[in-house]
Amino acid sequence: MELEKQIQEVYMSKKSINAYLYSKDDPTLSKDHPKRIFMDRDNGYLNSDVFPKNSEMKFLYEQDELLNFISSCLGVSPIYRWADPLACHAYNVMKPDGVLPWHFDSCEFTLSFMIQKPEKGGIFEYCPDIREPGNENLKEVKKVLDGDRKKVREL
């Protein structure tokens, strides 16, 4: 597998983050605000800029057919590739007992591929339409962060 050839270049880290991927607390917000609820993150990344030119992931990412397929499935057009040269098609790596907690990605949507089946865990959870432009829906986000599973779906 491509990643195994570069495993020594994976940057591993542990942090406490909120659902918005921030690691710093904002004491100007109320104590029960979702941005003040922190969870442990223990994972690593192989950034896109270190991939070889013949990378399988890079090849897949650059295919117009994949972009058109996603656009057709979602009914969204146009869809643009992320221009960030470090993160546009990075590998997210977890060791046993690693975790990437429930969070919002920094893009309107993200396409994730599970490259290797985990021995345990690895369940992808999401909450469809929990927020929308102009409405962060903080009350519902807080419920999910507090353990309410009514809106949570699994893949």
Language-model regions, residue ranges each:
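General structural signal for secondary-structure boundaries
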Residues: 1-2, 137
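Non-heme Fe(II)-dependent double-stranded beta-helix
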Residues: 2-69
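Catalytic core of non-heme Fe(II) oxygenases with the double-stranded beta-helix
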Residues: 67-155
